[in-house]
Regions:
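Non-catalytic signal-transmission and effector/linker regions of two-component phosphorelay proteins
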Residues: 1-15, 116-127
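Two-component/phosphorelay signaling modules centered on CheY-like receiver
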Residues: 20-39
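Acidic catalytic/metal-coordinating carboxylates
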Residues: 43, 69-72
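Active-site residues of response regulator receiver
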Residues: 62
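Short amphipathic alpha-helix used as the core "switch/output" element in two-component signaling
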Residues: 71-81
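Alpha4 helix (beta4-alpha4-beta5 surface) of REC/receiver domains from two-component response regulators
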Residues: 72, 92-109, 120
Length: 127
């Protein structure tokens, strides 16, 4: 059991899809806790493989990735795994927020953001 009396296997599995190494590391460090299991991939191809095998509870998804746009991946996730929650993280394109939410993202988090904003967004999406 963890400190909050949840069984370890009841922890939320989170997939971070982010190609920038520093940002991915910051996200992993910010999310490191007994309530979450955090995995990271660098591109959409690996994200699709991971989701098909592991079906995480939440995907933190960058928009501009080496092999495509995260917005396009949202459609795939919502069609195949509607129960998976999605938070789009982006700072490049202001129009991405409207597109991400219209496509099915549960929340949009604009870079840069604080650890508190990240945790608040995750709490709102998962609860």
């Amino acid at each position: 059991m963890t400190a909050n009396n949840k069984p370890k296997n009841d922890r939320t599995k989170i997939l971070v899809v982010e190609d920038e190494g520093d940002m991915a590391l910051l996200l992993e460090l910010a999310l490191d806790s007994e309530q979450m299991i955090v995995d990271h991939v660098h591109n959409l191809c690996d994200a699709r493989d991971f989701v098909d095998k592991e079906q995480p509870g939440l995907v933190l998804l960058d928009n501009r990735l080496p092999d495509g746009l995260g917005i396009d991946f949202i459609s795939y996730l919502k069609r195949k795994y509607p129960q998976i929650k999605i938070i789009m993280i982006s700072g490049v394109d202001p129009a991405a927020e409207d597109a991400a939410l219209a496509t099915g993202a549960d929340k949009f988090l604009r870079k840069p953001f604080t650890k508190s904003q990240l945790h608040d967004s995750i709490s709102k999406v998962l609860n």
